Amino acid sequence: MCIRDSNTSIPELTELGKQYIITDYDIHDDGRIYTDNFQKLIDLVYNAGGGVIVIPHGTYMTGALFFRQGVNLYIEDDATLMGSDDISDYPVCETRIEGETCQYFTALINASGIDGFTLCGNGTIDGNGLRSWKAFWQRRTWNPDCTNKDEQRARLIYMSGCTNVTVAGLHICNSQFWTNHLYRCCLLYTSDA
């Protein structure tokens, strides 16, 4: 079930719990990929009882991230969470895609079985998908019968079995494959995202 609620606004940072600013955890705006540091921070916030990861001004690169219960994400103005364009930064696992359960690449943002998950702010989640789309359309020129899954691409956001999800204010763009893949989620609140 998807609910579009015009009364949903971008939550205030203070509503999302203790703030963890990524630059305090060895994640930098320097073009390098910081997947391991991002995931360690997600796990740290989870183990501390929850809170909000804050992405400040700048562009920060990562591969697949796996969010956990109580961990939210806030992307500030002029801040970008940028996905790696290298498919090896998205591990293969059992997932739902194209109407079936199979082994396929993870998304940039992954959440499974979370109750109360917020992605918000006035910043950007950018899938960095140009390289993947060029490869997909090139494949289609020499094999018009290829399927969407034949070209190895990551989704941007994948949520499975989540409830009470808020996505507000963000600019979500340039996915390598599907942008928002919501599987068996309920009570999803979106606003200006």
Say what each PLM segment does.
Residues 4-37:
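Right-handed parallel beta-helix/beta-solenoid
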Residues 62-63, 78, 127-128, 174-176, ...:
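Surface-exposed loop/turn segments connecting beta-strands in extracellular beta-rich domains
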